[in-house]
């Protein structure tokens, strides 16, 4: 055999071994745990309090459903936001929530504008699970990305985010916190703004 073929075979074996190792590593770091809130199983990190993590995701999932139902039923009250509400309603029909690794590159993110939302549930400083209200604030941020036709943190995104915050306060699924006056650590980041001022 030529040296070229041997190198290609060795490279192929190394790539297959790497893929196998990474898939095993990923699967061993997370597992599905059933939430006592929704009876759905959520992918959470294999860390202490993983049942609490599934519980939190169940609460968040239920709150998203409350928000979705309210916006769907009352869409005509919010003519200015109607196209964004429609986009929101259409995109989260089959939403999957899961816990992002606390040491991941991103804290929380949305996949395909509403197919999946990964939430960091634990403090990078303490390892403790974050307060549900703080996680809900971050969830509303991610849901604003789902509803917004633009990418990044544009003025339209902020307008939709503020709208979702206000509706969530009215529905009692989020309690307003002035993070500018009382900053909060979230997954190693500091939330220090109050968009309602």
UniProtKB/Swiss-Prot annotation:
Protein keywords: Signal
Pfam families attached to this UniProt entry: WLM
InterPro entries: WLM_dom (IPR013536)
Source organism, top-level taxon: Viruses
Signal peptide: 1-30
Record's protein name: Uncharacterized protein R325
């Amino acid at each position: 055999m030529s040296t070229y073929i041997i190198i290609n075979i060795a490279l192929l074996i190394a790539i297959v071994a790497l893929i196998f190792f990474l898939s095993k590593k990923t699967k061993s770091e997370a597992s599905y745990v059933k939430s006592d809130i929704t009876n759905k199983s959520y992918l959470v990190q294999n860390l202490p309090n993983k049942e609490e993590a599934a519980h939190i995701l169940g609460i968040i999932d239920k709150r998203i459903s409350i928000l979705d139902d309210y916006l769907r039923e009352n869409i005509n009250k919010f003519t200015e936001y109607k196209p964004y509400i429609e986009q929101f309603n259409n995109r989260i029909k089959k939403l999957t929530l899961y816990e992002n690794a606390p040491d991941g590159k991103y804290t929380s993110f949305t996949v395909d504008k509403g197919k999946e939302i990964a939430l960091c549930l634990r403090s990078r400083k303490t390892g403790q699970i974050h307060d549900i209200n703080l996680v809900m604030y971050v969830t509303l941020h991610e849901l604003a990305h789902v509803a917004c036709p633009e990418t990044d943190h544009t003025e339209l995104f902020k307008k939709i985010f503020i709208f979702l915050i206000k509706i969530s306060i009215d529905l009692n699924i989020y309690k307003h916190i002035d993070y500018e006056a009382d900053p909060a650590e979230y997954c190693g980041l500091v939330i220090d703004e109050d968009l309602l001022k």
